[in-house]
A protein has these predicted regions:
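Short coil/turn segments at secondary-structure junctions
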Residues: 1, 33-34, 79
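Asp-based, Mg2+/Mn2+-dependent phosphohydrolase catalytic module
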Residues: 40-63, 72-108, 112-144
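Basic, amphipathic juxtamembrane/active-site segments
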Residues: 1-12
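Substrate-recognition element of Asp-dependent hydrolases with the DxDx(T/V) motif
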Residues: 10-47, 61-70, 119
Length: 144
């Protein structure tokens, strides 16, 4: 947790999307679990911290989805070729299975090509964030 840093404008982006009625989901590859760098409990602790900090500002993160797998990982139970590791759409599709979401109203913002590919594979819009204010980036997406 001590190494975690918020992306510029991230908190206010979460607040804006919450105020506009969006359900916010985080989908993240966590190959460090498969590599033995940290545990799933560590990932869950970080996610609880992030959600708690966001809530202090009035933002609500609906759910975190994470993939602990890596085909070439050093921890055997996580060293698998799964359907959830981005660019595969498994985590996004799981959110659609668990929540009543309209694909045409959903979008994903990610900082890597795999994020956008996962969004496209799931049938939603994906946007590549490459730095600067995430809030301004998101406002431009919402403007259409």
């Amino acid at each position: 947790i001590e190494d975690f840093k918020w992306t510029e404008g991230c908190i206010w982006t979460l607040v804006l999307l919450t105020e506009l009625g969006y359900k916010i989901f985080i989908v993240t590859n966590q190959s460090g679990v498969a590599r033995g760098y940290y545990t799933e409990a560590d990932v869950q602790k970080l996610h609880a911290y992030i959600a708690g900090e966001a809530e202090k500002f009035g933002a609500k993160i609906e759910k975190f989805y994470y993939c602990p797998h890596l085909k070439d990982g050093s921890v055997p139970e996580y060293a698998i070729d799964c359907d959830c590791r981005k660019p595969k759409p498994g985590m996004i599709l799981k959110a659609f299975a668990e929540y009543d979401l309209a694909k045409d109203e959903c979008f994903l913002i990610g900082d890597g090509k795999r994020d956008v590919e996962a969004a496209q594979a799931a049938g939603i819009k994906g946007y590549l964030y490459q730095g600067g204010s995430l809030l301004e980036f998101t406002k431009n997406i919402l403007k259409g």
